[in-house]
Structure formats: structure tokens, C-alpha cells
């Protein structure tokens, strides 16, 4: 059974690699809006949560260097799954195809079609969950992308704060409170808007706050303690709910608000 299963994984991996080969015929995912640059240097693949947000990102991006791949629907939790099983998921398969570097035994980072992979999800708890699912996949099945510093998280705003003629963008509640404390003077009224999702933003706003290399924030994903990271991913994303209970209870007092 083991050799047969291994053969199935290699066959599935080769199938994806052929579709994502950087030379010869290239069949890219239909939802991918690729960038125009032929040189990989400076290029970025943004994996965006949902078709609506993907549409805004496609309109607001720098077409020369930024590619957009919307991921509709629920992202697969790949923790504990074999690569063969993972490749049956269309969203994950499309991502591997777009990246071009293959997976498993056929993985080759030199064939990656972009300099950076950027995960872009809503700034709320749902968006954080989707980001966690994608990071789980990358950590388990494409870990070299993380080790080589090629994976980043975009930081879209959760709030827009208008104070007089000035506009500020806050990534979370703490950022909002900091801005109000530093910028609000006297009885000046603050007009605060909470975004429901990326799809609610106009393309120009998404560019100015999240896509523009001159004004955005990007967080590089790093693995500082391999053993501890492996334990946390297994406990939080694995099938055993009892493994998550101690983690949640240890941090219960840190939760001031629940975004439900």
C-alpha cells in the first residue's frame, strides 16, 4: 500500500508541475490575472480572499508586477492530509500551478514564477482564519518558500478614520485607539468606518493602503523555532479538538472582544 500511495502522490505532483512549467506550454488557472513582466524580479502573486475582493485587487494593482489569484469558497485545512489528497482540492491545485514551483518530490524553488507570494485576506477574524489555513498548507507542503523568505502577509486596514481633512488607516482595534490618542485634538470629531471586507474597498483605496509598495505594510513569514511551530500547528489545526483546549484556556483572559 505504501509504494502504491507514494506513486499516486508523485503522479499527482507531476501533473500539477507540467501545468505550471515555466517553459513550453503554460496552462494557468482561469481566475489568475497574471502580471505583464517577463522578468521575475520584483513580481508578486497576491492570493486574495474571495471573488469580490479579487475584482477590486485586479483593478487596483500594478499590472506590470502584481498578479492576482482569487480563492473563492472555503480554504481546505491541509493539516494531516497527504499531498495527493491536498492536490485534489482545486483552490490549492490552482495556487501551486500559479506559483510554478511544483510540490512534494518535484518541488523546485528556482522555478517559482514570482519573487514573492503575498496572502491578502480580510482584516477581521474570518480573514485571519483563512490566512491561517493557507499558512498551514505552505508550512506543511511548501515549507521552503517560507524558509527562503518568499512568503508575506498583506496588512489591509480594518478601519478608516477621518479627522478633519486628514485620513488615517488602522489595521486593528489597537491601531485605531493609538491613532485616536495621537491625532485627535480637543473636541475634534472622528468619523470612523469599519470595513466589512476587502470587496467593500474601492480599487484606488486598496491600492493606496495595501498594494502600493511605497505606502503598504508587508509582514514576512518566518519560522523561528521549528519544533515549537510544528507543535502549535499540529495542536491548533489538527483533528483532535482536545489538543486546542489548553491553548485556548491559557489565553482566554487575553480576549477582550470576540469577533463573531
Residue ranges and their predicted role:
Residues 11, 29, 133, 144, ...:
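Charged C-terminal transducer/switch regions of large nucleotide-driven machines
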Residues 44-49, 119, 196-199, 208:
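Conserved, well-structured core segments
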Residues 15-21, 39-43, 88-92, 125, ...:
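N-terminal start-of-chain detector that recognizes signal peptides
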Residues 1-7, 120-129:
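N-terminal assembly/transducer modules of large multi-domain enzymes
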Residues 41-111, 129-135, 139-153:
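Metal-dependent catalytic core segments for phosphate chemistry
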Residues 51, 73, 123-126, 156-158, ...:
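An acidic- and aromatic-residue-enriched active-site/binding cleft used to recognize and process polar
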Amino acid at each position: 500500500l505504501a509504494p502504491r500511495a507514494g506513486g499516486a502522490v508523485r503522479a499527482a505532483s507531476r501533473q500539477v508541475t507540467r501545468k505550471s512549467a515555466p517553459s513550453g506550454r503554460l496552462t494557468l488557472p482561469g481566475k489568475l490575472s497574471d502580471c505583464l513582466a517577463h522578468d521575475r524580479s520584483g513580481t508578486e502573486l497576491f492570493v486574495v480572499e474571495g471573488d469580490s475582493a479579487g475584482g477590486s485587487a485586479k483593478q487596483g494593482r500594478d499590472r506590470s508586477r502584481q498578479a492576482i489569484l482569487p480563492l473563492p469558497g472555503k480554504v481546505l485545512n491541509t493539516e494531516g492530509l497527504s499531498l495527493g489528497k491536498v492536490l485534489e482540492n482545486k483552490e490549492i491545485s490552482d495556487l501551486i500551478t500559479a506559483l510554478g514551483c511544483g510540490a512534494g518530490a518535484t518541488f523546485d524553488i528556482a522555478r517559482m514564477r514570482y519573487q514573492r507570494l503575498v496572502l491578502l485576506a480580510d482584516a477581521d477574524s474570518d480573514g485571519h482564519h483563512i490566512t491561517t489555513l493557507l499558512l498551514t498548507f505552505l508550512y506543511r507542503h511548501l515549507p521552503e518558500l517560507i524558509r527562503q523568505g518568499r512568503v508575506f502577509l498583506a496588512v489591509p486596514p480594518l478601519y478608516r478614520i477621518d479627522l478633519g481633512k486628514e485620513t488615517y488607516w488602522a489595521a486593528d482595534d489597537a491601531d485605531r485607539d493609538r491613532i485616536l490618542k495621537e491625532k485627535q485634538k480637543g473636541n475634534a470629531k472622528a468619523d470612523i468606518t469599519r470595513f466589512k471586507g476587502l470587496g467593500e474597498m474601492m480599487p484606488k483605496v486598496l491600492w493606496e493602503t495595501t498594494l502600493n509598495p511605497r505606502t503598504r505594510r508587508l509582514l514576512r513569514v518566518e519560522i523561528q523555532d521549528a519544533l515549537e511551530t510544528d507543535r502549535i500547528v499540529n495542536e491548533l489545526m489538527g483533528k483532535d479538538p482536545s489538543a486546542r483546549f489548553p491553548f485556548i484556556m491559557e489565553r482566554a483572559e487575553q480576549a477582550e472582544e470576540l469577533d463573531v
